[in-house]
UniProtKB/Swiss-Prot annotation:
This is Transcriptional repressor NrdR. Belongs to the NrdR family. Residues 49-139 form the ATP-cone domain. GO terms for biological process: negative regulation of DNA-templated transcription. Residues 146-166 are annotated as: Disordered. Its cofactor is Zn(2+). Binds 1 zinc ion. A zinc finger (unnamed) spans 3-34. GO terms for molecular function: ATP binding; DNA binding; zinc ion binding. The keyword Zinc applies. Pfam families: ATP-cone, Zn_ribbon_NrdR. Negatively regulates transcription of bacterial ribonucleotide reductase nrd genes and operons by binding to NrdR-boxes. It comes from Gluconobacter oxydans (strain 621H) (Gluconobacter suboxydans).
Length: 166
């Protein structure tokens, strides 16, 4: 593997470990020329996917772009990084298992919205507002009205919570 610091082709693997979810291998490497250390991550790619954009262009599927979008939506939310990574891995597995080589950007966006809706309502609204390009406050109102409350995620106290105990 080529060193990202000096470009030398000769690097050595010093340590290899499976990730927590078991879908990737992290390798710690050292360059024999400049002695810099760096980490690589290897993932199994079941098939080459391409994305069909709304304007008809086809581009290679970019897992990192999907991961960045998910992380932006979940920024400052109480969702651990490991959970975020599992969410992205699950989305990628769904896409790969679909049997399709070309997937529309609309389908990817819809899958991401559905997954975020299950994980965190605020992240869902954030992602959806960017993905659907909300330009008016009414769009936010409509999506909030359409959301069904998820059990255990209510901010309003139940009637029993408001009563004081004697």
């Amino acid at each position: 593997m080529r060193c990202p610091f000096c470009g030398h082709d000769d690097t050595q693997v010093k340590d290899s470990r499976s990730t927590e979810d078991g879908v990737a291998i992290r390798r710690r490497r050292v360059c024999s020329a400049c002695t810099q250390r760096f980490t690589t991550v290897e993932r199994v790619q079941l098939r080459e996917l391409s994305v069909t954009k709304a304007d008809g262009r086809r581009v290679p599927f970019d897992r990192d772009k999907l991961a960045r979008s998910i992380r932006v939506a979940l920024r400052k939310r109480p969702v651990p990084e490991e959970r975020q990574e599992r969410l992205v891995n699950g989305l990628v597995r769904q896409l790969e298992a679909s049997g399709e080589h070309e997937i529309s950007s609309h389908r990817i966006g819809q899958l991401a919205m559905d997954a975020l809706r299950e994980v965190d309502g605020v992240a869902y609204v954030r992602f959806t507002s960017v993905y659907r390009d909300f330009r008016e406050v009414e769009a936010f109102s409509k999506i909030l009205a359409d959301m069904k409350p998820i059990p255990g995620e209510t901010d309003t106290p139940s009637p029993d919570d408001s009563q004081e105990t004697p």
